[in-house]
């Protein structure tokens, strides 16, 4: 790398950082008084109130499907998959809940499929299909509502890496496919990628869980200069699962490291410092590359901390894309263009950067990405309900006729058919 090239990068970055730092405090303060309006219909959708637009009936399942799992291993409450737990708790006291199933628009089955953890705290999805099948068998035998639609008016929260494909490696997730019993149900999931077998039409893509209280505790003064140009902490290689280094993240993270490990504009490392949240608030751009799956909590953290997300995940379907203007607040870089990332970011007009920061300062934008306890207006819980409300009324044909083809209860891998 020539010294003239490095000098040009540093000069360009210095201009951006100086302008962003000077304007960041002003943008944050302005956001508190007068946030920039989100353009188009997205702003209206983001602030929709779902109350009065739908009613949800919650099945009363035996505790072994939910609460006992958390009691056995409370670490589930802090995992990035914890949305399935907090969604259940939210709905129990929500104004959209109905105790009369005959007036319900939607039926919710509170089954926790991500609470089987290793000693290291990693979720094991291998029992998840059996847990889900068992829960569906239970509701189909105890109530008549599943059988009249084969689940078409039911929704399930499935926050696994690849949703209801229930595997953390893409190749095996594709091989498994979505659990056959969920083919007609609406899936609320973190995984989103266009034209992928693990994302069926009509699914609602949501953010992963990131602990709101923990992030709140690490807030720094809003007028703190953003003195870091590009920031990332995480794996570049997963040597345990991908010794060759070409499959993990489709090689995008390896490319990041090989191209920019010595670039002074890029603060990237595998180290995860105690100042991680503070550092994101000091950065202009936060890298959000795919890992095994296209999504990660970094996306939530970047939005909450006002750091422009640089999304490196081809064909990703982002959370609440009909409400959050991702194209306006983020930067999209194709995986093949990672080697050009320095040029892409240093070439961005300063006015574009400042506008993205002003939009990110909008409190509604941040709130939509979070699952706070207790729930708050316009948070991720309410965005999920808005998504369900927009699917109403259910289309013709939701109620099955005697001549209609029913779901095959014996479809899928033999191991999934074992009793749980």
Curated annotation (Swiss-Prot):
Q: What is its main location?
A: Golgi
Q: Which GO terms describe its biological process?
A: cell wall organization; glucuronoxylan biosynthetic process; plant-type secondary cell wall biogenesis; protein glycosylation
Membrane topology of the entry: Single-pass type II membrane protein
- If you read the UniProt record, what top EC class would you report for this enzyme, in one word? transferase
Q: Which GO terms describe its molecular function?
A: glycosyltransferase activity
Taxonomic source organism? Oryza sativa subsp. japonica
State the superkingdom.
Eukaryota
Protein's UniProt name? Probable glucuronosyltransferase Os04g0398600
User: What EC number(s) does the entry state?
Assistant: 2.4.-.-
Mapped to this chain, the residue ranges on the Lumenal side of the membrane are 26-420
Cytoplasmic side stretches: 1-4
Give one Pfam family.
Answer: Exostosin_GT47
Q: Which UniProt keywords apply?
A: Cell wall biogenesis/degradation, Glycoprotein, Glycosyltransferase, Golgi apparatus, Membrane, Signal-anchor, Transferase, Transmembrane, Transmembrane helix
């Amino acid at each position: 790398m020539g010294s003239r090239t490095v000098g040009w990068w540093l000069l360009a970055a210095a201009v951006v950082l100086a302008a962003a730092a000077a304007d960041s405090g002003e943008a944050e303060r302005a956001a508190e008084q007068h946030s920039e309006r989100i353009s188009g219909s997205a702003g209206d959708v983001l602030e929709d109130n779902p109350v009065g637009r739908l009613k949800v009936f919650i099945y009363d399942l035996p505790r072994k499907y939910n609460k006992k799992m958390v009691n056995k291993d409370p670490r589930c409450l802090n995992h990035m998959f914890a949305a399935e737990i907090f969604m259940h708790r939210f709905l129990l006291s929500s104004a959209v809940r109905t105790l009369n199933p005959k007036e319900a628009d939607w039926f919710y089955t509170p089954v926790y499929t991500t609470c089987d953890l290793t000693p290291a705290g990693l979720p094991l999805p291998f029992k998840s299909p059996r847990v889900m099948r068992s829960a569906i068998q239970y509701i189909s035998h105890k109530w008549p509502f599943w059988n009249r639609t084969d689940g078409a008016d039911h929704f399930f929260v499935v926050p696994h890496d690849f949703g209801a494909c229930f595997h953390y490696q893409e190749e095996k997730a594709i091989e498994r496919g979505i659990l056959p019993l969920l083919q007609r149900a609406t899936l609320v999931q973190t995984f989103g990628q266009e034209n992928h077998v693990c994302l069926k039409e009509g699914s609602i893509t949501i953010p992963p869980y990131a602990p709101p209280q923990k992030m709140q505790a690490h807030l720094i003064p809003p007028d703190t200069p953003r003195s870091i140009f590009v920031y990332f902490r995480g794996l570049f290689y997963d040597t345990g699962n991908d010794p060759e280094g070409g499959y993990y993240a489709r090689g995008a993270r390896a490319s990041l490291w090989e191209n920019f490990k010595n670039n002074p504009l890029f603060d990237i490392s595998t180290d995860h410092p105690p100042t991680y949240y503070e550092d994101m608030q000091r950065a202009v751009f936060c890298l959000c590359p795919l890992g095994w799956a296209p999504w990660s909590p970094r996306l939530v953290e970047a939005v909450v901390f006002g750091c422009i997300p640089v999304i490196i995940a081809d064909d990703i379907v982002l959370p609440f894309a009909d409400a959050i203007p991702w194209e306006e607040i983020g930067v999209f870089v194709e995986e093949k263009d990672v080697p050009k990332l320095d040029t892409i970011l240093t070439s961005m007009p300063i006015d574009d950067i400042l506008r993205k920061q002003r939009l990110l300062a909008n409190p509604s934008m941040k709130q939509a990405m979070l699952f706070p306890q207790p729930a708050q207006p316009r948070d991720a819980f309410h965005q999920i309900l808005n998504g369900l409300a927009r699917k109403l009324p259910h289309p013709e044909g939701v109620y099955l006729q005697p001549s209609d083809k029913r779901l095959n209860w014996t479809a899928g891998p033999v191991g999934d058919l074992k009793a749980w």
